[in-house]
Amino acid sequence: MKLILTADVDNLGAPGDTVEVKDGYGRNYLLPRGLAIVATRGAEKQVEGIRRAQEARAVRGLDHAKELKDAIEGLESISLTVKTAGDSGKLFGSVTAADVAAAIKAAGGPVVDKRSLELPKAHIKATGKHAIVVNLHPDVVAKFHLNVVGA
């Protein structure tokens, strides 16, 4: 069965790749979960849309990555205000990579893809300063501190 991947699938490919898989794997796993579509002429247009979206998110090379790094590290302070549970410093919920990306943009920084952010743990669940790493390019990494403040 010939399919076009719409999401990243381990050991198979990336979005937009055309792959040949066994019929059962395609019908019972990939198609029901929305990880792939059947390869048709109309699907080629969807592949182009997927590729354009990937290119828009991708950093445009080493020079552009260095510019983004300078912009992120040049920000005075990046802070995020969230609801807390009393005076203990614990948060209602948690701070995710999407929240951090929005905080960077709100502080006057560039738009950063949430998948390029590395949080200290999967989510930040306490107030205070937290070290955040942004993987902009295989050779360029930006580091900054996020100040999480309780509301």
From Swiss-Prot:
Keyword Ribonucleoprotein belongs to the record: yes
GO CC terms, sorted: ribonucleoprotein complex; ribosome
InterPro entries linked: Ribosomal_bL9, Ribosomal_bL9/RNase_H1_N, Ribosomal_bL9_bac/chp, Ribosomal_bL9_C, Ribosomal_bL9_C_sf, Ribosomal_bL9_N, Ribosomal_bL9_N_sf
Keywords: Ribonucleoprotein, Ribosomal protein, RNA-binding, rRNA-binding
Gene Ontology biological-process annotations: translation
A molecular function (GO) term: rRNA binding
Family (UniProt): Belongs to the bacterial ribosomal protein bL9 family.
Function of the protein: Binds to the 23S rRNA.
Name of this chain's protein: Large ribosomal subunit protein bL9
Organism (species): Rhodococcus opacus (strain B4)
Phylogenetic classification of the source organism: Bacteria, Bacillati, Actinomycetota, Actinomycetes, Mycobacteriales
Gene: rplI
